[in-house]
C-alpha cells in the first residue's frame, strides 16, 4: 500500500487516522442527526400538518362559498323568471287596457261627432226657421203697412176716418204681438 501513495514514509508515519476520533464523530453526528430529525422533524411535520389543515379548511370554506353562491344564483334566476312572468302579465294587461281604452275613446269621439253633426243640423234648421220667420214677419208687416196705407187713404176719402183708423191700428198691433 505504500507504493500507491506518492508520499514518502515520513509523511505517512505522521499522517494516521485516529479511529477513536472518527468513531466519536460518527456517534456525535448520529446523535445530532437523531435530535435534529426528532425535534425538527416533528416541528416540520407539525408545520406541514398545520399547513395541510389550513389548505383543507380553505378548500372547505371555498366549497361552502361556492355552494352558497350557487344557491343564490338559483334563487336569483327563479326571481328573474318570476319577474319576467310578472312583466309579461303587466304588459299584456296594460296592452289590453290601452286597447280597450282606445276603443272607448274612439267610440266617444264618434258619439261627439254624431252629436256635433246633429247640433249642426239642428242649428241650421233653427237658423233657417228664424230666417223664414223673419222673412214672414217682414212680409206680413210690409203687407199690413201697405194695407193700412191703402185703407187709410180710402177712409180719408170717406167721412169716418178717425174711428176706423183707431180700429185698424188696434187690430194691426194686436196681430203683431
Curated annotation (Swiss-Prot):
Concerning InterPro entries, the annotation shows: ATP_synth_b/b'su_bac/chlpt
Q: Which UniProt keywords apply?
A: ATP synthesis, ATP-binding, CF(0), Chloroplast, Hydrogen ion transport, Ion transport, Membrane, Nucleotide-binding, Plastid, Thylakoid, Transmembrane, Transmembrane helix, Transport
Q: Which domain of life is it from?
A: Eukaryota
CDD domains xrefs: ATP-synt_Fo_b
Q: Where in the cell is it found?
A: Plastid, Chloroplast thylakoid membrane
Q: What is its main location?
A: plastid
Segments passing through the bilayer: 26-44
Looking at the UniProt record for this protein, which Gene Ontology cellular component terms does it annotate, in alphabetical order? chloroplast thylakoid membrane; proton-transporting ATP synthase complex
Coiled-coil ranges (or none):
none
Work out whether the entry's keyword set contains ATP-binding. yes
GO molecular function per UniProt: ATP binding; proton-transporting ATP synthase activity, rotational mechanism
- Tell me if Ion transport is a UniProt keyword of this record: yes
Q: Write down the membrane topology.
A: Single-pass membrane protein
Q: What does this protein do?
A: F(1)F(0) ATP synthase produces ATP from ADP in the presence of a proton or sodium gradient. F-type ATPases consist of two structural domains, F(1) containing the extramembraneous catalytic core and F(0) containing the membrane proton channel, linked together by a central stalk and a peripheral stalk. During catalysis, ATP synthesis in the catalytic domain of F(1) is coupled via a rotary mechanism of the central stalk subunits to proton translocation.
Q: How does it assemble?
A: F-type ATPases have 2 components, F(1) - the catalytic core - and F(0) - the membrane proton channel. F(1) has five subunits: alpha(3), beta(3), gamma(1), delta(1), epsilon(1). F(0) has four main subunits: a(1), b(1), b'(1) and c(10-14). The alpha and beta chains form an alternating ring which encloses part of the gamma chain. F(1) is attached to F(0) by a central stalk formed by the gamma and epsilon chains, while a peripheral stalk is formed by the delta, b and b' chains.
Q: What else is known?
A: In plastids the F-type ATPase is also known as CF(1)CF(0).
Q: Which family does it belong to?
A: Belongs to the ATPase B chain family.
Name of the protein: ATP synthase subunit b, chloroplastic
Organism of derivation: Bigelowiella natans
* Taxonomic lineage from the root: Eukaryota, Sar, Rhizaria, Cercozoa, Chlorarachniophyceae
Amino acid at each position: 500500500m505504500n507504493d500507491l501513495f506518492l508520499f514518502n514514509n515520513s509523511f505517512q508515519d505522521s499522517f494516521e487516522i485516529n479511529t477513536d476520533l472518527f468513531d466519536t464523530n460518527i456517534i456525535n453526528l448520529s446523535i445530532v442527526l437523531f435530535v435534529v430529525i426528532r425535534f425538527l422533524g416533528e416541528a416540520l411535520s407539525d408545520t406541514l400538518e398545520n399547513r395541510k389543515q389550513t389548505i383543507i379548511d380553505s378548500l372547505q370554506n371555498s366549497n361552502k362559498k361556492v355552494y352558497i353562491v350557487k344557491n343564490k344564483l338559483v334563487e336569483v334566476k327563479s326571481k328573474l323568471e318570476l319577474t319576467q312572468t310578472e312583466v309579461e302579465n303587466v304588459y299584456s294587461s296594460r296592452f289590453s287596457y290601452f286597447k280597450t281604452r282606445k276603443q272607448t275613446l274612439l267610440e266617444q269621439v264618434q258619439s261627439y261627432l254624431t252629436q256635433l253633426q246633429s247640433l249642426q243640423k239642428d242649428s241650421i234648421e233653427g237658423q233657417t226657421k228664424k230666417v223664414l220667420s223673419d222673412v214672414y214677419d217682414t212680409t206680413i208687416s210690409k203687407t199690413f203697412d201697405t194695407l193700412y196705407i191703402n185703407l187709410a187713404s180710402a177712409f180719408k176719402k170717406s167721412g169716418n176716418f178717425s174711428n176706423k183708423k183707431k180700429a185698424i191700428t188696434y187690430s194691426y198691433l194686436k196681430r203683431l204681438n
